[in-house]
């Protein structure tokens, strides 16, 4: 029987069947093109985009077309992130010297300008605040003062987040606030006041309920209101100061590099005077929208409003949590006091450098041009020079407890800075500055200016609205800084071509690049809260409609009204801009 079985196994198949697979070889599943593209699309973009854009450079002679080719390639790489954003930003260091646009020395200098030093120094000072937990103390104290009912707590969290985000990075601010919200919500849920997440989803299988484990529980509307509130407040708060977000430094650097003789400079106090009022309006209206959408504001019979009404009973519970968190910080230390003094000193130095209404300290020192990078780095150096405590003084006295057994730490350590500073932003910002300067040196600026003269027939207000809409749309899908690097240089040349004040378009566009509310990938605060609270993309996309409409309308209105108070010449084409326009367009000034 065994012999017969063996024969049956090894009997060759009939002649009409084609054997393409050898005995013992396992058949492989068919390769799908969709799988190939899904896994290797980035490689295809990196390989094909430079080839497909080659006609721009090969069919047209001149440095301006070589620069345009590079701009197209980098723009696509930035938007698709086929290469890491920071790596794409390094391409001008390689390409500009080879293409004969700028020398290596000229290009590399643009990667460490005064604006960049100020930005990186500002991040380091903000990290000193984070290192000593001064930001937590401030946040918890303000929440204690505002109150802990659901609506008051939400308002307090949003306003604290907005204020802190003006000075420290949006991501760090959001990351700090998330655990505070989580602790409050968990305690409220334990007391039966509210729920953090919806009940698990069940499906009927064979007449029995089965838990759908593949779908984790998603947050309730009250939870969404708190988490999305701090994410949006972080993005909006960053619009308030020059150092609030990298996007602000991007358009400041590009504007000042392109228009060095401009009489309207982007200094610290003027920018705050321009942007803080609109920032407050954005934030307050966004708070009202989130309250209406998630907590039933002005809808007393809604389910959400009734849940908030029950939540008022938990105000004492929330207050206990906040009080305990504040108590855990202990009394304010000499470490925190010194950091707070240095931070206030830095801000005062920003405001008094060249205030305009009186001689600033930079005018009194000497005739050299002193920028805001100087006080920023001065404070950074002081953070390393000053001790975190003065226990070493016990060596000089017999009182005050035991003497320290080791060295006294400084206000911040380099190890903390090294791990926390987003060093890649140096290249991302520098790449934008290099592209802006390369477009001017190569003549691409002149080319774009000539091409955009036809837009002169449109009213300025229509152009402004279109620019804001385009910036808000693009920044929803890509890095804010990358989008600013792409559109700001184009707007600079367009403003010269159609003879309107460059700041009229550049400043609103730069602010609009920070207004990303729809997707987790839009901005780091969105990604942080989405991951922390398991927020579904569709919930964030729907919730982002309100803040998007609010910020677009508010920014447009403020630019047409308050903007003219801060910059009275925005409605005119100034003489210094006429000189740049003549140089860019190849015409005489008129």
Swiss-Prot record:
Membrane topology type: Multi-pass membrane protein
A single GO molecular function term of this UniProt record: pyruvate transmembrane transporter activity
Disulfide bonds: none
Keywords, alphabetical: Cell membrane, Membrane, Transmembrane, Transmembrane helix, Transport
GO cellular component: basolateral plasma membrane; plasma membrane
GO biological process: citrate transport; determination of adult lifespan; pyruvate transport; regulation of triglyceride storage; succinate transport; transmembrane transport
Localization of this protein: Basolateral cell membrane
Expression induction: Completely inhibited by DIDS. Modest but significant inhibition by phloretin or furosemide.
Tissue specificity comment: In adults, abundantly expressed in the fat body, basolateral region of midgut cells and oenocytes. Low level expression is seen in the halteres, procardia, restricted regions of the esophagus and hindgut, base of the legs and in a subset of cells in the third segment of the antennae.
Classification via Pfam families: Na_sulph_symp
Stretches that traverse the bilayer: 43-63, 82-102, 115-135, 153-173, 224-244, 270-290, 329-349, 373-393, 457-477, 509-529, 540-560
PROSITE patterns: NA_SULFATE (PS01271)
Keyword Cell membrane: yes
Function statement: Cation-independent electroneutral transporter (not associated with membrane depolarization) of a variety of tricarboxylic and dicarboxylic acid-cycle intermediates. There is also small, but detectable, transport of monocarboxylics. Transport is through the epithelium of the gut and across the plasma membranes of organs involved in intermediary metabolism and storage. Affinity for substrates is citrate > succinate > pyruvate. Fumarate, a-ketoglutarate, and glutarate are also transported, but not lactate. Transport mechanism that is not coupled to Na(+), K(+), or Cl(-).
Database matches in PANTHER family: SOLUTE CARRIER FAMILY 13 MEMBER, SOLUTE CARRIER FAMILY 13 MEMBER 2
Extra facts: The life-extending effect of mutations is likely caused by an alteration in energy balance caused by a decrease in transport function.
Family: Belongs to the SLC13A/DASS transporter (TC 2.A.47) family. NADC subfamily.
Name of the featured protein: Protein I'm not dead yet
Source species: Drosophila melanogaster (Fruit fly)
Gene for this chain: Indy
């Amino acid at each position: 029987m065994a012999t017969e079985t063996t024969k049956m196994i090894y009997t060759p198949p009939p002649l009409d069947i084609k054997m393409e697979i050898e005995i013992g070889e396992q058949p492989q599943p068919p390769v799908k093109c969709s799988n190939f593209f899904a896994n290797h699309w980035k490689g295809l973009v990196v390989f094909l985009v430079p080839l497909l854009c080659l006609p721009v450079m090969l069919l047209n002679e001149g440095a301006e077309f070589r620069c345009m080719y590079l701009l197209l390639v980098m723009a696509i790489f930035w938007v698709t992130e086929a290469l890491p954003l920071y790596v794409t930003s390094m391409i001008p260091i390689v390409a500009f010297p080879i293409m004969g646009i700028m020398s290596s020395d000229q290009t590399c200098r643009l990667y460490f300008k005064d604006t960049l030093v100020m930005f990186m120094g500002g991040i380091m000072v903000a990290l000193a605040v984070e290192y000593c937990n001064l930001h937590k103390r401030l946040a918890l104290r303000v929440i204690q003062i505002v109150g802990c009912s659901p609506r008051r707590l939400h308002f307090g969290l949003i306003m604290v987040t907005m204020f802190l985000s003006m000075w420290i990075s949006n991501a760090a601010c959001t990351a700090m606030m998330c655990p505070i919200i989580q602790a409050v919500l968990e305690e409220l849920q334990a007391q039966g006041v509210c729920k953090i997440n919806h009940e698990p989803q069940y499906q009927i299988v064979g007449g029995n309920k089965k838990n759908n484990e593949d779908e984790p529980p998603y947050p309730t509307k009250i939870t969404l209101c708190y988490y999305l509130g701090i994410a949006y407040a972080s993005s909006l708060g960053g619009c308030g100061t020059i150092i609030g977000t990298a996007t602000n430094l991007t358009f400041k650097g590009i504007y000042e590099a392109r228009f060095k003789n401009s009489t309207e400079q982007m200094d610290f106090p003027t920018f705050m005077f321009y942007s803080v009022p609109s920032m407050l309006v954005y934030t307050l209206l966004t708070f009202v929208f989130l309250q209406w959408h998630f907590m039933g504001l002005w809808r007393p019979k809604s389910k959400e409003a009734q849940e908030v009404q029950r939540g008022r009973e938990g105000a004492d519970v929330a207050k206990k949590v906040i009080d305990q968190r504040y108590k855990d910080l202990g009394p304010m230390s000499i470490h925190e006091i010194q950091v707070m003094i240095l931070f206030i000193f830095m801000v005062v130095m920003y405001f008094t450098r060249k205030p305009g209404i009186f001689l600033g300290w930079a005018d009194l020192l000497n005739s050299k041009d002193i920028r805001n990078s100087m006080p920023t780095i001065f404070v950074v150096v002081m953070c390393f020079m000053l001790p975190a405590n003065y226990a070493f003084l016990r060596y000089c006295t017999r009182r005050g407890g035991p003497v320290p057994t080791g060295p006294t730490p400084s206000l911040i350590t380099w190890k903390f800075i090294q791990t926390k500073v987003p060093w890649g932003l140096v290249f991302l910002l520098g790449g934008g500055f290099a592209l802006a300067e390369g477009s001017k040196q190569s003549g691409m600026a002149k080319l774009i200016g000539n091409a955009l003269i036809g837009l002169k027939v449109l009213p300025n207000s229509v152009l402004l609205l279109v620019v804001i809409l385009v910036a808000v749309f693009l920044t929803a899908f890509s890095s804010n800084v990358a989008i600013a690097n792409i559109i700001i240089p184009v707007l600079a040349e367009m403003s010269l071509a159609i003879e309107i004040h460059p700041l009229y378009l550049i400043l609103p566009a730069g602010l609009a690049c920070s207004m990303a509310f729809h997707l987790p990938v839009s901005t780091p605060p969105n990604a942080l809260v989405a991951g922390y609270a398991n927020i579904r993309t569709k919930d964030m996309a729907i919730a982002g409609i309100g803040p998007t409409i609010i910020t677009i309308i508010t920014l447009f209105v403020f630019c047409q009204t308050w903007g003219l108070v801060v910059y009275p010449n925005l409605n005119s084409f100034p003489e210094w801009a006429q000189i740049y326009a003549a140089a860019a367009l190849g015409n005489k000034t008129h």
